[in-house]
């Protein structure tokens, strides 16, 4: 996984812009229902970043707080109030999960992990993954 630094991204209408100044921790694909719904697709993706390495350049995102599907801690979800694009959500403990599709250039990124494979659509294959989790990473049930 590689990302030219600094990298910038933002929402679809351009009202909100951000800059990434540090290396990503990881990029993951998630097949949980929450990620499917927020992405509008059959999976979601999250680029884990240290909160200190994410700088807001312009605009002010709106925030919606939702409970976690697996009963874990609630997540604060940040999005553009004008175009509605989800930009990131809190990952806990000083981390943010950036939606990589909001980056100006995500062409060098490739996921290494996937979670919630028990909810993965059967026709999807993602090459190059190092780790797959049957449910939530960190739980006993792994696939």
Task: Name these PLM-found stretches.
Residues 1-143:
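A short Gly-Trp-Pro
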